[in-house]
Amino acid sequence: LRILKLFGHEDVKKVISTSGAEQEYFLVEKSLYDQRPDLVLCSRTLFGAKSPKGQEMDDHYYGAISPRVSYFMRDLDTELWQLGVFAKTEHKEVAPGQYELAPVFADSNTATDHNQLVMEIMKKTALRHGMVCLLHEKPFAGLNGSGKHNNWSLSTDTGMNLLAPGKSPKDNLQFLLFLAAI
């Protein structure tokens, strides 16, 4: 707080840690999932041939989302909104059948709780749509895995992000100071 006061921010009363965990996941047809004991028991493939299709096609990341997955995402959003978890973005990811949900950031404690809710609600919602949501970090050999990117920062109670670069040299000095201190 003393450093912020040196930069002229007299109104700041506290600094908090904020976070937003981008959750990647795979959606698999339930009937196909049920035929794979390794997926059922371990949430990943342990035997069998590698995927015949990798990331070389154009049906990932910027590809269109199928209507079925769109309905899943809509229902997921509705359920999460009712719990106070707001998704900022949802899109396809690099591997076939892989997607990502990025919630709006919150204080780190709340964001951690939100991520637990997101994972639980994803699984339940997928089942209602005849799919299984796989959250294992590497469910399929030879394909990108599912990561969890954590967008972490420090913010003030007045809404200032201390890890956002400034627009002027003076404002950038504050950013560089906090970045170096971390």
Where is each model-derived feature located?
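Glycine-rich, acidic/polar active-site loops that bind/position phosphate-bearing ligands
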Residues: 1-135, 140-182
